[in-house]
Every structure is written in C-alpha cells, then in structure tokens.
C-alpha cells in the first residue's frame, strides 16, 4: 500500500471530509469534538493569527502542558505556514527569554498555569501573548474564538 505524502493541514482537511461527524477529541474538561468541530476551530485560530499579522515562515511558540488546545494550536500554526516552536513547560524565565529571542518568536500561546514564567520576558520580536486555555490575548483579553 502506498501512502500519500500530506502536510498537516491537508491531513486534517482530508480527515474532516471523510469523518466530519466522527469523534476527534474527547476530554473531560473540554468535552467532545467531531472532526468538523476540530477543523472549524483550527481555521478560526489560523485566521486570527493572520489577523494578528503572522505570516508564512513566522515563528509561533507554544508553552503549555498537554491539552486539546495544544493540538488545535499546532494545526492552526501549520495551516498558515508558520513555524511552531514548542517550549518545554519546565523552563525558567531566563531560558524562555533565550529561546524566544533566538527563534525570533512573534506570538506565544501560553497556558494559564505557565503565564507567570513569561513575566519579565521581552524580546524585540514578541508581539502577542495568547492564553491557550481559552485563546484570549493576555494584553487585552480579546477573545480569538468566534463564539
């Protein structure tokens, strides 16, 4: 059997077209999501990243423990051709500063539990901090979800 070579966005879109009503995620805290729900959320977050000025090749960091929104964020970043920079949750502020600056990260998605780690972290590139728990920006708390 020959497998097609697909990008992450193509893989998700194909899965959605074949299995749109099937369950894709099921977590106690966030409930159930079908492939169509997942795809819609990925496209919504991807569109908001574009609205924030993120372009193909820009770096977007993810600082969070495992959660459904981590995967949604990864797919959204890939969907617009940006580069995901996953950051280990155990890093301290100094390490975060170095990683974000060296990678020239433009946007970071951070979990509420780890947001304090970013206090004092400033780089000439970082423009937006977004809470991954509910996809709101930490500076204005404008919700990114189209609910």
Language-model features: where?
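Structural core segment of the AMP-binding/adenylate-forming
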Residues: 11, 52, 79-144
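Conserved AMP-binding/adenylate-forming core of the ANL superfamily
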Residues: 4, 13, 21-67, 71-75, ...
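Proline-centered helix-kink/hinge sites
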Residues: 20, 68, 86, 145-147
